[in-house]
């Protein structure tokens, strides 16, 4: 049985997000995935939470992480499914199956990009979606999730 993590949120990053900092910096900026994870841990801690940060380029592994979040009774999920946002009904279904409050994040404004990026399956399984704020969107997502959970910043 998985060890409970009731004070933890899952921060899930999908394909190619391991390339942040070097991948198309004119679109994604120069911050790395390590920078994103540090930002998430810091923001989560300000609400008395831990951030379990995961990244995978494989759809099935992302689904396994979502199922693990359910088994461990995590409080919430922040997800940037990358390109899978626009194609993966399986990720959508996994998020709905676990019924964990979820916020979708995209570093860029997906609605100002190619038309195939305008639709997001993962957004339909989330209570909120943020895009276009750069990596700051992760901080905003955690703050929004904390508000949804009724958590206040710790002094």
UniProtKB/Swiss-Prot annotation:
Reaction catalysed by this enzyme: 3-dehydroquinate = 3-dehydroshikimate + H2O
A single BP term in Gene Ontology: aromatic amino acid family biosynthetic process
UniProt xrefs under Gene3D superfamilies: Dehydroquinase, class II
Active-site residues, Swiss-Prot/TrEMBL: 28, 106
Domain of life: Bacteria
Alphabetical list of InterPro entries matching this protein: DHquinase_II (IPR001874), DHquinase_II_CS (IPR018509), DHquinase_II_sf (IPR036441)
UniProt binding sites for substrate: 80, 86, 93, 107-108, 117
Keyword Lyase among UniProt keywords: yes
One GO MF term: 3-dehydroquinate dehydratase activity
Keyword line: Amino-acid biosynthesis, Aromatic amino acid biosynthesis, Lyase
Site positions (Transition state stabilizer): 23
EC code(s) of this entry: 4.2.1.10
PROSITE patterns in the record: DEHYDROQUINASE_II
Pathway the protein acts in: Metabolic intermediate biosynthesis; chorismate biosynthesis; chorismate from D-erythrose 4-phosphate and phosphoenolpyruvate: step 3/7
Alphabetized SUPFAM superfamilies for the sequence: Type II 3-dehydroquinate dehydratase
Enzyme class: lyase
Chain's role: Catalyzes a trans-dehydration via an enolate intermediate.
Database matches in NCBIfam families: aroQ, PRK05395.1-2, PRK05395.1-3, PRK05395.1-4
HAMAP family: AroQ (MF_00169)
Quaternary organization: Homododecamer.
Record family assignment: Belongs to the type-II 3-dehydroquinase family.
Name by which UniProt lists this protein: 3-dehydroquinate dehydratase 1
Natural source organism: Bradyrhizobium diazoefficiens (strain JCM 10833 / BCRC 13528 / IAM 13628 / NBRC 14792 / USDA 110)
Organism lineage: Bacteria, Pseudomonadati, Pseudomonadota, Alphaproteobacteria, Hyphomicrobiales
């Amino acid at each position: 049985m998985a060890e409970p993590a009731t004070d933890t949120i899952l921060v899930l990053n999908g394909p190619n997000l391991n390339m942040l900092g070097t991948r198309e910096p004119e679109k994604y900026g120069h911050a790395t995935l390590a920078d994103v994870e540090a930002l998430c841990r810091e923001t989560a801690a300000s609400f008395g939470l831990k951030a379990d940060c995961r990244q995978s380029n494989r759809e099935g592994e992302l689904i396994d992480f979502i199922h693990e979040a359910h088994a461990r009774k995590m409080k919430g999920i922040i997800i940037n499914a990358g390109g899978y946002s626009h194609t993966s009904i399986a990720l959508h279904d996994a998020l709905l199956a676990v019924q964990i409050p979820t916020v979708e994040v995209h570093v860029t404004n997906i609605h100002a990009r190619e038309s195939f990026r305008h639709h997001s399956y993962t957004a339909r399984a989330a209570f909120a979606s943020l895009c276009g704020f750069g990596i700051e969107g992760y901080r905003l997502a955690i703050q929004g999730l904390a508000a949804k959970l009724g958590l206040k910043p710790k002094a």
